[in-house]
Amino acid sequence: MAYKSQHGVDDMVMLSKIANDSILDNLKKRYGGDVIYTYIGNVLISVNPFKQIKNLYSERNLLEYRGKFRYELPPHAYAVADDMYRSMYAEGQSQCVIISGESGAGKTEAAKLIMQYIAAVSGKGADVSRVKDVILESNPLLEAFGNAKTLRNNNSSRFGKYMEVQFNGIGDPEGGRVTNYLLEKSRVVYQTKGERNFHIFYQLLSGANQQLKSELRLDTPDKFNYLSASGCYTVDGVDDSGEFQDVCKAMKVIGLTDSEQKEVFRLVAAILYLGNVGFKNNAKDEAAIDQQSKKALENFAFLMQTDVSSCEKALCFRTISTGTQGRSARVSTYACPQNSEGAYYSRDALAKALYSRLFDWIVGRVNSALGYKQNSQSLMIGILDIYGFEIFEKNGFEQMVINYVNERLQQIFIELTLKTEQEEYFNEGIQWEQIDYFNNKICCDLIESKKPAGILTILDDVCNFPKGDDQKFLDRLKESFSSHAHFQSAAQSSSSFTIKHYAGDVEYCAEGFVDKNKDLLFNDLVELAACTTSKLIPQLFPEINCEKDKRKPTTAGFKIKESIGALVKALSACTPHYIRCIKPNGNKRANDFDTSLVMHQVKYLGLLENVRIRRAGYAYRQTYDKFFYRYRVCCKETWPNWTGGFESGVETILKSMDLEPKQYSKGKTKIFIRAPETVFNLEELRERKVFTYANKLQRFFLRFTLMSYYYSIQKGAADSMKSNKERRRLSIERPYQGDYINYRENFELKDIVKKNGNEKIMFTHAVNKYDRRSRCQRRVLLLSDTAIYFIATEKNKDKEDRKKRPWIYVQKRRLLLAGITSVELSKLSDGFVVLKTMNEHDQIFECRRKTEFLGTLIKAYKTGTLRINYNNSIGVAIKASKQGGKGKERIILFEKGIKPGESVFKGTKVSTPSDGLPADTVPNLTPPESLPVVSIPIYKPAMNAKNAPQNSGGPASNVKPSAKALYDFDAESSMELSFKEGDILTVLDQSSGDWWDAELKGRRGKVPSNYLQLIKNAAPPRAGGPPVPTGNRAPTTTTTSGGSTRGGFNNGPSTAPSGRGAAPPSSRGGMAPRGGSVAPPSSRGGIAPRGGIAPRGGMAPRGGMAPRV
């Protein structure tokens, strides 16, 4: 059923009026009702609520979205995640989600929700859990080192991140990697008033224990220049101390040892002390360490694990080489002193280099923990969380690069959702009216173009000249773009320029562009890393151990263009999904909707054009062959055989759905469907059909496996008892079921078993257990592959809990199978069993299904061969006292009684029934047949085939077989048919296994097949049905498909009671026909015995009662 919203419309394609005002009003109405998600087709719009909304992200709500179609539940990030996850396997195509929006719109939180959902719905194996833990725990770690408080966002990502998660063939994550883009390392040395440095600095100072603070010589944030300049140390609602503990936990998850963690924190502290190092010029105008910062330099050297003099030299001097390097050339090297300005530049360059390389090292360790598989054919889900569009009072090189990246992402959105969609309609010959939209490619070219040179190319050219500076760069821009529509130069005296971005006009200050683009780090600073005894720092500077690269170093602008180009290539290889984030106000306040700010975002995000195209266009398109192969199962004309073409097959499928021609259009190579509901209906129908066919296969193989399993148990028990013990009449022919207490639905019993590990329950039954005074006590017996449980039902002593559960299960005894020395039974037809143990008292109990219990115990016993003794005088070591222990041995005597019925236990004597069958009575067991192998031809349609589907052959014979009733049968429901022994029934259908459709005197109904004997020379069953055995044995053995055997027993010439050849099969509470493993299929398509262990559409029962297939 489709979900209906009470707050506006869920999908803005359904708006009655298509205008920006209508979009704004709908978003405002939903925001006021705490409904922050809205669709435009398959694009999710997310408005940051700046507060926690109750139950929106609860575990229960997350699981609600699993396997649901988009229209069934309210819009949500979980719905996008589920669509990605399912589409990945349905289409065999990697997926990605592009999360965009300006800073503070909620992109990082949306990315975390996608990862949270994928982790929750995938598998739980050891290796899978490891990968999921790394995926989830990498978030707080990367946020600590890569996020910061800005004026617009308390948790602003100051780097770009693209996380790729690899999946194996069953949908579980098996690896992944994180690619990071352009960390804003300038934030390490400078922050605007009211902003903070990266979170990790404050977390370390606040959350480190006293020992770590002492080791790292930490102080309060206001004592460090790199933190105090902005005047902001805390964030409302953020616990830096608690988040530091999360960071430490995340470090352990990704595999960082305690010593490596300490090395990381040591380097973070070193950067803080580096910022406290000050300089002044001496008489020669040379930089020298300020006396007041000598202590800071000492602390920096201590934390860097090097000497003070090396640090001072690296900061105050710059090594210059002259001459041409070569074997015969003379090279002169000079240590030139810098002035204080140059020293400050070197200090900040070193701080930025140390931090950015530490961040890259952490990302590398995350990737090592994820274990990305190179050259793998695995499908992937990519999650892009990158810095949002930024406009500040003063915008520099970093803001231009960030906004350039957002321009490229907007271009991808335009290319894939607006431009490409309209071009596809034209190329496929679909009638379409062109819709205009703003294409920001002109702005992207302005920044990145090579020919003619764009802004970044010009900046690189200026950096190549020794005398290139910011003013030269600005002059080149004015010269090149004076007439460009998206570039505007300021007044002649100003050092700024303006770019007209898709999100608005941004004025950039050219000051610092050249230096930041060069991104230089002098060799003196690199060589300082070679002097340290730290194990971490040399890993951050691999150039220490490499030969000097004579090539010119790449610029920051070149690197970002290269990395964004690679990102676009990776995104283009995936099926994209979109989350467009909107910030409702600039004050980070809940319940505050700034109409003008939101309208600005609605316009520059192009939501109106997106609505128009989605409304006028088609929600779904697919090539004919892929559509046909996916949905052919939905139509009886195309399944299982179709010899027509793909296009005609697709049209046949759609006609079977009663679709009107206007609801879809046929292109040259693709089918286009207008309404998403049509596709949802197709998917639902396909799921039902596939489920039905899969269950038919599962039922067949499960039936065969169960028959093999129970045959081995029956044979084991029969071989043991043959000639050793009299048999009860109902025991000899009773089919086995395994579970007689509905264990698979009893979660309290399951909880008791779970306490001892992952045990597989193989047999359950209610038994009579006898204590040391021969008193009978009712118990539940559970036999697992490891132990035997005896569980009592007692009154609940907890007064509060008693209202809900007046009775509870209490484990009284657990016998390990390895501790059982032998099993003792009498030679008579009773149901008593004695379990003898090594060091504990013996256990005596009575079980109505002791034969099945014994056969299952033989199969489960792994410690050699189980000893089974038969004797009418059995010694039982009784319990010494209430505290336990092995007491005296008591002899129990078994005597045959004079009446049929149940056994009677009094004192030390057991009186058994008088009507037991002889000990040589054995069941008539036939081993299951081998699984049949059938070759089925595969029909592959040709694109232009004109021949019709082939005829499947003539109809089967209409002559119905007859069967003779061997026993009386009384119907218990209107669907069943009663009959008497000797009646002749017409068998209408044998396809349901143990329950056949039959007719008697004009009445029709279900009848148990093992109450009947097919009459010889009767018509055969339907084509492909099971063979009918012949013979005059009474009762007969019938073989069902899969090798199921059913029948009576062969007890020799003197065992048949007068008047009847054999007793009727157990029809109440047994395994077949009314409770067997081969029973009428349930409504879910599984094998559903009445009161048995029926799997719900699966291969094995949930309780673990059946063997694993």
From Swiss-Prot:
Q: Which residues are in the Myosin motor domain?
A: 7-687
SMART domains given in the database record = MYSc, SH3
CC per GO annotation: actin cytoskeleton; actin wave; cell leading edge; cell-cell junction; cytoplasm; cytosol; filopodium; leading edge of lamellipodium
Classify the source by domain of life. Eukaryota
Q: GO:BP terms for this protein?
A: actin filament organization; actin filament polymerization; chemotaxis to cAMP; endocytosis; phagocytosis, engulfment
* Localization per Swiss-Prot or TrEMBL: Cell projection, Pseudopodium; Cytoplasm, Cell cortex
Q: Which GO terms describe its molecular function?
A: actin filament binding; ATP binding; microfilament motor activity; myosin light chain binding; phosphatidylinositol-3,4,5-trisphosphate binding; phospholipid binding
Q: Gene3D superfamilies recorded for this chain?
A: 1.10.10.820, 1.20.5.4820, 1.20.58.530, Kinesin motor domain (3.40.850.10), Myosin VI head, motor domain, U50 subdomain (1.20.120.720), SH3 Domains (2.30.30.40)
Phenotype upon gene inactivation: MyoB and myoD double mutant exhibits reduction in the speed of whole cell translocation. myoB, myoC and myoD triple mutant exhibits reduction in the speed of whole cell translocation.
Instruction: List positions binding ATP.
Output: 101-108
List, alphabetically, the InterPro entries matched.
Answer: Kinesin_motor_dom_sf, Myosin_head_motor_dom-like, Myosin_TH1, MYSc_Myo1, P-loop_NTPase, SH3-like_dom_sf, SH3_domain
Q: Where is this region: Actin-binding?
A: 564-586
Region Disordered: start and end of each range?
1017-1109
Q: Report keywords, A-Z.
A: Actin-binding, ATP-binding, Cell projection, Chemotaxis, Cytoplasm, Motor protein, Myosin, Nucleotide-binding, Phagocytosis, SH3 domain
Principal subcellular localisation of the protein: other
Q: Which residues form the SH3 domain?
A: 958-1017
Where the record annotates domain TH1, the positions are: 725-919
Comp. bias regions, Low complexity: 1030-1043
Subunit structure, as described in the record: Myosin I heavy chain is single-headed. Dimer of a heavy and a light chain. Inability to self-assemble into filaments.
Outline what the protein does: Myosin is a protein that binds to actin and has ATPase activity that is activated by actin. Myosin id may have a role in chemotaxis and aggregation; it could serve to stabilize and even retract cortical structures, such as pseudopods and lamellopods. Involved in the process of phagocytosis.
Free-text domain note: Myosin tail domain binds directly to anionic phospholipid membranes; myosins I could therefore move actin relative to membranes and vice versa. TH.2 and SH3 bind tightly to F-actin; this together with the nucleotide-sensitive site in the head, allows single molecules of myosin I to cross-link actin filaments.
Please state which protein family the record places this protein in.
Answer: Belongs to the TRAFAC class myosin-kinesin ATPase superfamily. Myosin family.
PANTHER family from the xrefs? MYOSIN (PTHR13140), MYOSIN ID HEAVY CHAIN (PTHR13140:SF513)
UniProt-recorded name of the protein: Myosin ID heavy chain
This protein's species is: Dictyostelium discoideum
Gene that encodes the chain: myoD
